Amino acid sequence: EVFKILNYLKKKKINYLDTASAYNQSEAKIGKYFQKTNKKFRVITKFSFKGNNSIEKQFIKSLHLLGYLPDTILAHNYRDYINPKFHEQIKNIKKKYLIKNIGVSLNKISELNKILKYKKPDVIQVPLNILNKSFLDENIIKRLKKKSIRILGRSIFLQGLFYKDKKFVFKKFKNVKKKYMQLLKIASHEKMTLGELSLVWANHLKDVDNIILGVDNFPHLKKNLDSLKKRISKESYNLIKKINLENNKITKPYLWKKQ
């Protein structure tokens, strides 16, 4: 099924794949596809200092599994990015393998401020969905564009939460019902699921360079790509703009396990 998915992505002219050194199986399968078809994607991969392996060792392992040089390397989190060892090792990798872009995956604005004080990245990967628009703040966008930093949006479906029953959502998270119901009403008006609404909305944000979608299987991928043909009315777009729960735990998956 992996070959079917990757062939379909090529057919649809989607040229980026997002992976990570932690996803060994994923990198190995992508590598087999490259080897057998000679069709290449531009690969974004992430590395972290978790465990004893250096970034360089992880990179060599990923390179072996992929059989192909990644286009972009990201620090898995801001702590890794502001670690001098990360840049020391990345400098060696960049020089030896001519890697184009170095960046970082972030969770919140305070992390952005810390990494910008330390060293400008080429790219940042940030959470982005109809409940969390924190990185779309006009001043932040201007700041990033001025520094020519590319923005990649992830967590479009809020870790799959937008496909859960609303009763589950209201039971798990406090003080979300009113705004969540407003979004469900907009989705209903646009004849979409909440997940589709978030995807179509994110795909049409002019300030975001690329969006990242997780793929469970081929039907899931096809459904998501078909959804991209849809449009949201200007009225609904403006309503979505006013709704946010950025300060609520619902938009912070990294805190969910602590509940």
Feature-to-residue mapping (PLM):
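N-terminal binding-site loop/beta-alpha segment at the start of enzyme catalytic domains
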Residues: 1-41
